[in-house]
Amino acid sequence: MHPFSRLFRNIQSLGEEEVQELLGPPEDALPLLAGEDLNHRVADALNLHLPTADLQWVHKTNAITGLYSNQAAQFNPHWIQPEFPELHLHNDLIQKLQQYFGPLTINEKRKLQLNFPARFFPKATKYFPLIKGIKNNYPNFALEHFFATANYLWTLWEAGILYLRKNQTTLTFKGKPYSWEHRQLVQHNGQQHKSHLQSRQNSSMVACSGHLLHNHLPSEPVSVSTRNLSNNISDKSQKSTRTGLCSYKQVQTDRLEHLARISCGSKITIGQQGSSPKTSYKSISSNFRNQTWAYNSSRNSGHTTWFSSASNSNKSRSREKAYSSNSTSQRYSPPLNYEKSDFSSPGVRGRITRLDNNGTLPQCLWRSFYNTKPCGSYCIHHIVSSLDDWGPCTVTGDVTIKSPRTPRRITGGVFLVDKNPNNSSESRLVVDFSQFSRGHTRVHWPKFAVPNLQTLANLLSTNLQWLSLDVSAAFYHIPISPAAVPHLLVGSPGLERFNTCMSSSTHNGNDSQLQTMHALCTRHVYSSLLLLFKTYGRKLHLLAHPFIMGFRKLPMGVGLSPFLLAQFTSAIASMVRRNFPHCVVFAYMDDLVLGARTSEHLTAIYSHICSVFLDLGIHLNVNKTKWWGNHLHFMGYVITSSGVLPQDKHVKKLSRYLRSVPVNQPLDYKICERLTGILNYVAPFTLCGYAALMPLYHAIASRTAFIFSSLYKSWLLSLYEELWPVVRQRGVVCTVFADATPTGWGIATTCQLLSGTFAFPLPIATAELIAACLARCWTGARLLGTDNSVVLSGKLTSFPWLLACVANWILRGTSFCYVPSALNPADLPSRGLLPVLRPLPRLRLRPQTSRISLWAASPPVSPRRPVRVAWSSPVQTCEPWIPP
């Protein structure tokens, strides 16, 4: 049925004879449909012209919102946070894959090397203050969202997905280190790494015996025992560790005094002749700036754990003994580690033994509330004093490594949303690294192939048994180089963010900036913390502290991540495909699809792949593993042997939205954009395709309103109620050729020549399109040869609207191949000349598979390699099945 038959009969400006002519033979109707006058008359009848500016626009239509209609995000206080398994790919992944699948191809090696490890080094990076770490997307649930997001980040850290910043040059994480992390090891499982300890001892001995004495002591030879010097300093360090009362400046002064005493004939004195130690320190320490050791008493055991007065004495003594036994391996510390440290030593009630960036003593907010008197009935002091042991202020992972300088800043904010539109019970972390997609810090991401609709139909429209697999937390499988951590920083500002007048640091030893901390003591905060305490328990203290973390695995908020994930999964699919040539295996992002002729054979392949993936460290989501039978559901489509159709849920959603559109009201262009996005998904399955939406495209491009008439709306509804599948292309030889001039057209086949003229001159592209439509109508050929690039592209939205709609209906399922004008046998008939008698050019269509590497011809598996399936395959190996 003609797509415009009902529409033309409902337009009163078109007479009955004119309608019959427009619906008549194509050689007469197609040139008329290209006329400008007819298109304007139909547009006036359908009210498709853009409205005037004095009308008031509609900004919301039921489920679709437009301009000035920001939809508030919904926070779920009962969100379930996902649990992440130990995601750790095998350390020698490429060698392990070669054991399973044999020698890898060049492309497979290249793709895997891009991901092992991934590298991300933008030219410029903007750093934001820590207070912007957690975005306040839910103002009514700010406190609940803050603790839920902080808990999500700590969950990722415990799974080995994030690094925790200890100081500006040190990172700590949980899990097994990779080979590139071994080179930066500081400590592993609480033990100081040998290479790091040896390098620190060597540098310290050289600094003591050589550089320092040469610059600041007399020129005559001096006998200095570096062993005694190091032991003396170590004894002082242990003593100060036990007492917990020695400051950083005092340690430096003691070391300078020791160097002065061992120098023979030196006149350097400290603390004598009426000069204060502070003055002497300032006058001398400048010469020792680059060679002074930083005293860090919490290198290995540095958790600030807070206990109440009742249970403090016994626990502190046991911690002192355990700590002093390990202090011999910590006698030297890198410079700046203590000055920039974010951790503290084992704490005693009311005492902090760490320094902040200004050399003063910062205060734990939780401890401060304990040591102050309650300000009222809703004071946080009542919550803090309810437990004797709140646990550590921070934690240290299994592995500590060195890193490039990492500032106390972040590069992107985080917040929580629903896991997907159909699952609001679970949460998903959103990382905003949009600075790398705009502005002067924009990064041009690499492009990768995405399967289009025709490619999926060509490759997957087969009568096979299908199975789909889903990689659990696929992005978090791919590791990142530690050097990229300073560009991928997230964090939490701590509970202090809810009181902007307060800072967690103190100045000159007093608590001047902590005097306003009781501004947090409100009824809302108090009741919220009580409810959160039921959820998190003593972990609430850890979540209330500020922290900074960097991604150790691939984050989802960077444009590089989809590219790297696509390379990784396509390389894995290529290996499986090469070893099982009798089945179909392809991957797109984190979805892996297997196809075989029988379900028994598919089960065997599935069991083998699961065991291989488990050994490699790739985790599959068992809950999302689905057996589809002969109807594969993939990317929102239903793929069968007869073609591809959209899933029912998309068709129902489209019909519901389209019926809710009001008639004869100007809708703003944002509503048109959102509606067009929904209609575009199903448009390839309609008779007129994308051309039916050209009036909406025009309104969106003009950034103006659009008015739906009742005729246009009913016509769209009739189009989208009748859907046709997209079928696979066939590899056939071209036997029909078409060509045109502005005044005539010509068609050449193997047995006849056809030609004709137009009633009036037409643009050359329009004439070529009409000639192709006539060739399709009269010969029924599925493959046409033409020399016009516009017709070859298949994009008909640049033609007159009525002609584009009818041409899309006629040429549906038709393929084109290019033939040069000199070799086109229809060229001379289109000019009204007799053609030269010569054979037709032999052009064969190759079905479109170039948009994605789902399948490629590969060499057979070596016969010496053991079979991959334990029992004999139902498919004969001598006749492998090859996708079309």
UniProtKB/Swiss-Prot annotation:
Enzyme Commission no: 2.7.7.7, 2.7.7.49, 3.1.26.4
Alphabetical GO biological process terms: DNA replication; symbiont-mediated suppression of host innate immune response
Means of activity regulation: Activated by host HSP70 and HSP40 in vitro to be able to bind the epsilon loop of the pgRNA. Because deletion of the RNase H region renders the protein partly chaperone-independent, the chaperones may be needed indirectly to relieve occlusion of the RNA-binding site by this domain. Inhibited by several reverse-transcriptase inhibitors: Lamivudine, Adefovir and Entecavir.
Record-listed Mg(2+) binding positions: 470, 590-591
Keywords: DNA replication, DNA-binding, DNA-directed DNA polymerase, Endonuclease, Host-virus interaction, Hydrolase, Inhibition of host innate immune response by virus, Inhibition of host RLR pathway by virus, Magnesium, Metal-binding, Multifunctional enzyme, Nuclease, Nucleotidyltransferase, RNA-directed DNA polymerase, Transferase, Viral immunoevasion
More info: Hepadnaviral virions contain probably just one P protein molecule per particle.
Role according to the record: Multifunctional enzyme that converts the viral RNA genome into dsDNA in viral cytoplasmic capsids. This enzyme displays a DNA polymerase activity that can copy either DNA or RNA templates, and a ribonuclease H (RNase H) activity that cleaves the RNA strand of RNA-DNA heteroduplexes in a partially processive 3'- to 5'-endonucleasic mode. Neo-synthesized pregenomic RNA (pgRNA) are encapsidated together with the P protein, and reverse-transcribed inside the nucleocapsid.
Protein name as catalogued: Protein P
Species assigned in the record: Woodchuck hepatitis B virus (isolate 59) (WHV)
Name of the coding gene: P
